[in-house]
Amino acid sequence: LEILAETHGTRPDLTDQPIPDADHTWYTDGSSFLQEGQRKAGAAVTTETEVIWARALPAGTSAQRAELIALTQALKMAEGKRLNVYTDSRYAFATAHIHGEIYKRRGLLTSEGREIKNKSEILALLKALFLPKRLSIIHCLGHQKGDSAEARGNRLADQAAREAAIKAPPDTSTLLIEDSTPYTPAYFHYTETDLKKLRELGATYNQSQGYWVFQGKPVMPDQFVFELLDSLHRLTHLGYQKMKALLDRGESPYYMLNRDKTLQYVADSCTVCAQVNASKAKIGAGVRVRGHRPGTHWEIDFTEVKPGLYGYKYLLVFVDTFSGWVEAFPTKHETAKIVTKKLLEEIFPRFGMPQVLGTDNGPAFVSQVSQSVAKLLGIDWKLHCAYRPQSSGQVERMNRTIKETLTKLTLATGTRDWVLLLPLALYRARNTPGPHGLTPYEILYGAPPPLVNFHDPEMSKFTNSPSLQAHLQALQAVQREVWKPLAAAYQDQLDQPVIPHPFRVGDTVWVRRHQTKNLEPRWKGPYTVLLTTPTALKVDGISAWIHAAHVKAATTPPIRPSWRVQRSQNPLKIRLTRGAP
């Protein structure tokens, strides 16, 4: 035994010989027997003359498991002390000295590759071995009739365990879905983290009852609190605030350790709630990039208008981001051919070749035809985030302005042909002051548009116009006095600090489902973040970039133990085990 313990033992100083200067000498025993067709079980820790701890165990508990529980409880109560502990169980004795560590090294499997019995109790025992300052676990004979201290202590432990099993009250624990753990102090097991927190709170240990007390209530360990709150949440799927309000209103017989923190984690990690609840995160507004002079940066969009003459039902809108100048062309179809045709025949001859084009992800813009033409011409075509109209805010707002103006003009004139009224709508849009108090026409040409008063009797003064040289000098003055300050103002907006979104590569996120069917969750996923920009994300499984406002963080749900069915040698019996999936 000494050689095996030296080679395979868990604790190097663990011995099977009594420690002379021990603080405590205790005796442990577990009892399991049939009574009226039901298997009862109990465990106890005693001295020679006094019962220190005795508890009933769940019906059906085996004698081996009861012995492990009793020995583990003794080690926990002797934390930081020198302890001699006697047990008449060869199984518990050998597990503590040798077999437990061997099982652990084998992955808690038998030589046949099956999961060992009493897995959780063995792990708890191996962990508790390090709690006492010095430890000796000694095997003694069971059912001794002598009058030695060893015999008296063993008899008292056996009697206390049996009486605890017989006097066990009927099971009145609340039935919780997928969880049959009894939430009673008799089954509370405190971890090192729990004990540290309890000492910080100033809780007291009830040695006779075997649990900690704070504010006059038994303290429920952190793991039990998690299981209870997780079960309650899965029954109701209420949020953190409402669950907290319900718990505050109720009079719980227990003090729940780390209740609010655990409740927040349970609510955040629920995958069902994550797919349905709205996102509370607020993403800071970004800054739109504009051109540094007219004609370099355009935003393009198709907008649908009620059919006019000759079947025109679409409007292709170009907006210069620097000046706000708008060009709009009625079309019968929404195709890439029309986009490239208007770009080459209308925009390029009058304003020069654009450097940047910004659009949404419409079919006419993502088409290979449009992208190939832009690549050949050296145009940087930027596709905005899907379902994020703010990214194309300037052209989207212009669409609304044109439609509202056309509606007013059709009502005022009585005509239903909006194509005929489009030039008037464009004139209004081009001569409406922008954020800096200048109209797009004034930014582009340096002066208001010429207006003729046809009722003026002196028409001769309108016949003379400035020379070409005067026009060129005026345009140079416009570039100097208007364009440069305006470009500087746009640059100042870009230089303003932008609060980045909190998502990083490798994070798990939920993505908003923009078109939901009946009873379909509003979020899909979770997905892993692959790439990020200050305002958008690229995730696995979705080709388009996603704006940060359309995602929310996904909390990794806890791994819940699941039930598994195992065959037994008896064809009329099956074995149910619970463990990690």
From Swiss-Prot:
InterPro entries: Gag-pol_Znf-H3C2 (IPR039464), Integrase_cat-core (IPR001584), MLVIN_C (IPR040643), RNaseH-like_sf (IPR012337), RNaseH_domain (IPR002156), RNaseH_sf (IPR036397). Its EC number is 2.7.7.49, 3.1.26.4, 2.7.7.-, 3.1.-.-. Signal peptide: none annotated. One of its GO terms (molecular function) is nucleic acid binding. It comes from the Viruses. Residues 20-166 form the RNase H type-1 domain. GO terms for biological process: DNA integration; DNA recombination; establishment of integrated proviral latency; symbiont entry into host cell; viral genome integration into host DNA. Residues 290-448 form the Integrase catalytic domain. Keywords: DNA integration, DNA recombination, Endonuclease, Hydrolase, Multifunctional enzyme, Nuclease, Nucleotidyltransferase, RNA-directed DNA polymerase, Transferase, Viral genome integration, Virus entry into host cell. Specific enzymatic cleavages in vivo yield mature proteins. Gene3D superfamilies: 1.10.340.70, 2.30.30.850, Ribonuclease H-like superfamily/Ribonuclease H (3.30.420.10). It catalyses: Endonucleolytic cleavage to 5'-phosphomonoester; DNA(n) + a 2'-deoxyribonucleoside 5'-triphosphate = DNA(n+1) + diphosphate. Belongs to the retroviral Pol polyprotein family. During replicative cycle of retroviruses, the reverse-transcribed viral DNA is integrated into the host chromosome by the viral integrase enzyme. RNase H activity is associated with the reverse transcriptase. This protein is synthesized as a Gag-Pol polyprotein. This is Pol polyprotein. It comes from Radiation murine leukemia virus (strain Kaplan). The gene is pol.
